[in-house]
Amino acid sequence: MSIKYLTFYYPNGQKKSEGNYDGQEPIGDHTSWFESGNIKCEAVDLTESKILFTHWYENGQMKSKGVHKDYFESGLWTYWYDNGNKKSEGFYLDKDERVGKWKFWHSNGELACIGIHKGWSGDGLWTFWDETGNKVHEREYRESELLDVWENLRADGCSDELVDKYKKYIFN
């Protein structure tokens, strides 16, 4: 292993990335930029296996922030829309497995849903709101029952468009 501090540049001379590298692989602290010069990603080495990652959209708004442990999302992660409004927030166990209470927001800043994750399925009360803040659905879901939520939302009068948004919020 031959670790070197390197700086890479775009053809226009703008910095692309810099930090410690093992060959072409970033190791530890690392920063990258968009070709426009705006910061894209910052990685701060917390321990040998934990790195704090912060990502930005090209417009300068923060995109996501959280810790990677052994290359997987771990602990509290927060995500934002490119307009600066919060998109989602919740906890990961090892290997990107969601756990506990997760919150999801519509792009206009209104709360979209709150639910309890157990892995990638539900395990508890899930509440959904439309883009104007009206509660549209609330129900306890256990394990694989969360897959039934889409039909239950439609039965409660949610449009296909709104149901599709919830799917993207929860599973993307």
Segments (PLM) and residue ranges:
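Glycine/tyrosine- and acidic-biased, solvent-exposed loop/turn segments at the edges of beta-strands
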Residues: 1-172
